Amino acid sequence: MGGTGVIDHFLEVFTRYIDGGFGLLSGEVTFIATTLIVIDVVLAALFWSWGADDDVIARLVKKTLFVGVFAYLIGNWNNLARIVFESYAGLGLKASGTSFSVADLLRPGKVAQTGLDAGRPLLESISDLMGWVSVFENFIQIACLLFAWALILLAFFILAVQLFVTLIEFKLTTLAGFVLIPFGLFGKSAFMAERVLGNVISSGIKVLVLAVIIGIGSTLFSEFTAGFGGATPTIDDAMAIVLAALSLLGLGIFGPGIANGLVSGGPQLGAGAAIGTGLAAGGMVMALSLIHISEPTRQAE
């Protein structure tokens, strides 16, 4: 549970309790489904008995198939939701061409660890520039490299948190949908089940988008840091990494909104997203600076 694995432990605990909720709620869901089936079939039988010219056999077959489909959905809801998740996650990872697997995507701590690994060459370069005299001679370069390292960590940590929230959202959506799916058996309450299915698909698209962003981002930053070839990166190299980290940070913050745009039919990313990313990054860096300034003051007191 140490290091970046703490977020994996949180996800494991949440997942275990949410998956246990399906077993705890199965009795109530079965009761709701049975009640709605009885109401629907009784009403249908009354209407069929009044309509002498209707084809009762055809209507009975249609009603049986309809009830059977919903019974299958209710009985296998958790497994079907898992298949949807793995399908969308697999598509996103395949599109990005990364070495990440679906199992790795279920570990947000691995995403955070990827950021630590991507920023480690910068820290090693900073340590090579440190010295009693060289620290003052290379102060600007050290500051730029440290700033680039902080932004890389920030970008990947935000991606890890976004992935954690998305996974929990998907689990909670499927659990809440498990309770609402039986209402699709009755015509007057069918809209509740329709929204559940739409929400599950929307959450799956969000997983796909995050999988693409994480896969491409991890590949790009491994190429960035490997491109130094053991040499100390210059200020231009550091600023290039800052630009890349800001781009990944913007995608991590606003990228999941693409899923909402696909469902609603409107674009979600634009200049406002870029400005918001810059302001968010600036605010976080300023907060870190204030913390570093306040620490010597507290020690002096």
Where are these regions (language model features)?
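Cytosolic juxtamembrane regulatory segments of multi-pass membrane proteins
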Residues: I275-L290
